[in-house]
Amino acid sequence: MLAKYTPAAAWFFAPRKTDDLGRWASTIREVTQRRTSIWVQVGTVAEALAVTQACKPDVLVVQGTDAGGHGRERGASIVALVPEVADAIAALSLPPEETPALVAAGGIADGRGVAAALVLGAEAVVMGTRFLACPEAAIAAGYRAEVVRASDGGAATARTKVYDQLRGTTDWPEGYNGRGVLNRSWEDAANGVPFEENKRLYEAAMELGDAGWGPQGRMTTYAGTAVGLVKGVMAAREIVDEVREGARQVLGRGGEKL
């Protein structure tokens, strides 16, 4: 399948054993004659070093804890994580062909975030939460509306395992959880409501369709701390164009305040 339909990239995340990455990467490179880039998402400096030595990735996606959805329970924002990973990789003194490109993830939703990531040492960025608010995203309308509604993302979201427990998606490796917008399910768990009752209410909310989302709803809205920067729904191409131009403007006037 890989030989016939060769993907541009294979993106790995949260392996149970880091050593598995070496075997997977080797197989993909052999089958695709190295036409498929190997991307690995990491959340700590130690993980970045272990992954680099295990499979020589083409790209390290350095995910800070501001990211929505799943990631490391313990870590740092990209402000500290990206430069420390960059320094640690540089200290390995790898030849250029074995030095991974760094791509920043987590808390980036506009040109300012992109500009910051590039200055910190990333070569590119990936955005998740911002693209939830585009018509191309295959999510429920209620989910999308909640992403647009939410603000003050640092206070309105939390890293937790509650949503996985309610959804039955508890097979993540140790040390991972997910960041989502706070709702009644999270509040009830924090206030000591028995899990069985919280689960019953969650399952009832599933029958409400789009009305199941929202601050008084119970459906999960995975999103990062930059959710407050998402102001409306835009086409994916328009988001890319706007963010790219915003980054150019910020970088262009970066020296004015020095």
Residue ranges and their predicted role:
Residues 41, 105-106:
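Short His-Asn-centered micro-motif
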Residues 1-96:
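Active-site entrance/lid segments in N-terminal catalytic domains of soluble metabolic enzymes
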Residues 72-103, 109-258:
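Conserved active-site-proximal phosphate/metal-binding subdomains
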Residues 17, 108-109:
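Gly/Ser/Thr-rich loops at beta-strand to alpha-helix junctions
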